[in-house]
Swiss-Prot record:
EC number: 1.5.1.5, 3.5.4.9
Protein name as it appears in the record: Bifunctional protein FolD
Its biological purpose: Catalyzes the oxidation of 5,10-methylenetetrahydrofolate to 5,10-methenyltetrahydrofolate and then the hydrolysis of 5,10-methenyltetrahydrofolate to 10-formyltetrahydrofolate.
UniProt-listed GO biological process terms: L-histidine biosynthetic process; methionine biosynthetic process; purine nucleotide biosynthetic process; tetrahydrofolate interconversion
Domain of life according to the entry: Bacteria
Catalyzed chemical reaction(s): (6R)-5,10-methylene-5,6,7,8-tetrahydrofolate + NADP(+) = (6R)-5,10-methenyltetrahydrofolate + NADPH; (6R)-5,10-methenyltetrahydrofolate + H2O = (6R)-10-formyltetrahydrofolate + H(+)
Assembly description: Homodimer.
Organism per entry: Bacillus cereus (strain B4264)
Length: 286
């Protein structure tokens, strides 16, 4: 048995084509979705991520605005910029690129973004709504993961999902999203004593730990769906995931590659949230 490779880049392109059509229809009604991205400092990785978001906006027809601020900016000044964007009707989504400089409290910044424009899904109100199964902006990477699993046509309801990793960005929320889909969810983390045994029970295995090729075939139930969220750079310069892809390929039923797996879905779901926000706001641009 050789696993079917879930090509996240192809799924993302299909969804972006659908978003492009939606944006065209919105513009016919005078509604132009708008995303503001705040970049603080000159971190090369952050700048690269921001470029990807700008490119995605351009691709589907979303208006994007990049606000570049110096590393030395005060927290007060950054909060004032968010307040300005909260009140700007042209902007449906606000994203502050993380990480921020150490003198700025990320929690205060995230909580200042209006929940109606929280297209990253990080605001405590968004998280609370997600936890209780209410309509809200879902965090982009976890949402993208669920969409990739749905591409397999597997009925998630009743399946056992094992999540290895418990970060606030991926691990915790992705488990909650699968719980909302009526799956049975188990979390594993650095203190889990029988991780391999638990992992082998998974119909759907989500791995997000940041350790290159940690998960090998002996962690995998035959025929399982394996979603690899990790992105690690080896000494050779080559990218790899948290799953030993070649080793697991003959055991899993479905598997995502790294790169071109989960990554492309993250920005696509950000674009999706921005379009949804524009629909909800329904503000006609003049």
């Amino acid at each position: 048995m050789v696993a079917v490779i879930i090509k996240g880049n192809e799924v993302a392109e299909k969804k972006r084509a659908q978003l492009t059509e939606e944006v065209v229809k919105l513009k016919e009604q005078g509604i132009v979705p708008g995303l503001a991205v705040i970049l603080v400092g000159e971190d090369p990785a952050s700048r690269s991520y921001v470029k990807g978001k700008e490119k995605g906006c351009e691709q589907v027809g979303i208006y994007s605005e990049l606000i570049e601020l110096p590393e030395t900016i005060t927290e007060e000044r950054l909060l004032a910029e968010i307040d300005r964007l909260n009140g700007d009707d042209r902007i449906n989504g606000i994203l502050v690129q993380l990480p921020l400089p150490k003198h700025i409290e990320e929690k205060a910044i995230i909580e200042r973004i209006s929940p109606e424009k929280d297209v990253d899904g990080f605001h405590p109100i968004s998280v609370g709504r997600m936890m209780t199964g209410q309509d809200t902006f879902l965090p982009c990477t976890p949402h993208g993961i669920v969409e990739l699993v749905k591409e397999t046509s597997l009925d998630i309801s009743g399946k056992h999902v094992v999540v290895i990793g418990r970060s606030n960005i991926v691990g915790k929320p992705v488990g909650q999203l699968f719980l909302n889909e009526n799956a049975t969810v188990t979390y594993c983390h650095s203190k889990t004593q029988n991780m391999k045994e638990l992992s082998k029970l998974a119909d759907i295995l989500i791995v997000a730990v940041g350790r290159p090729k940690m998960i090998t075939a002996d962690y995998i139930k035959e025929g399982a769906v394996v979603i690899d969220v990790g992105v690690n750079r080896l000494e050779t310069g080559k990218l790899c995931g948290d799953v030993d892809f070649d080793n697991v390929l003959d055991v899993a039923g479905y598997i995502t590659p790294v790169p071109k797996g989960v990554g492309p879905m993250t920005i696509t779901m950000l674009l999706h949230n921005t379009v949804e926000s524009a629909k909800r706001a329904g503000v006609v641009c003049k």
